[in-house]
Regions:
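Membrane-interface helix-loop junctions in multi-pass transporters/channels
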Residues: 1-128
């Protein structure tokens, strides 16, 4: 399959998943904090850590699978630009500390999620 088409299919699925999670989070958790962006960034970090660890250590993801899942799906599912603008808006609307909580939370929890994803991939492989 054409590599551009693989990226486009993955991106369409990732963007729709991101949108649905954003709507769900806004309805369920409220609009006082960018919960949707936080959730997709953490989940995306976890899945990326899992896929890249499993894909390089055991499964050997094909170039096509990486284009579809990593570049396409996760590239459109997670977002840095929304995170930056939402952090700026939080600073303006709710103060510096709320904004810093968002910045620190996305970075620290995202990193932790990537580490946990990698650990899960190793566990799935039987490598502990």
């Amino acid at each position: 399959m054409n590599r551009y088409l693989l990226v486009a299919i993955g991106a369409a699925l990732g963007a729709n998943a991101r949108y649905l999670i954003g709507v769900w989070a806004g309805n369920r958790l409220g609009a006082d904090f960018p919960y949707g962006t936080f959730i997709v960034n953490v989940a995306g970090s976890f899945v990326l850590g899992f896929l890249l660890t499993l894909g390089t250590e055991r499964l050997q993801l094909s170039a096509e699978a990486r284009l579809l899942l990593v570049v396409g799906f996760l590239g459109s599912f997670t977002t840095f630009s929304s995170y930056a603008v939402e952090s700026l808006n939080l600073w303006r609307d709710a103060g510096l500390w709320r904004s810093l909580l968002n910045v620190a939370g996305n970075n620290l929890v995202g990193l932790l999620a990537a580490i946990l994803g990698a650990m899960l991939a190793r566990w799935v492989q039987g490598g502990g």
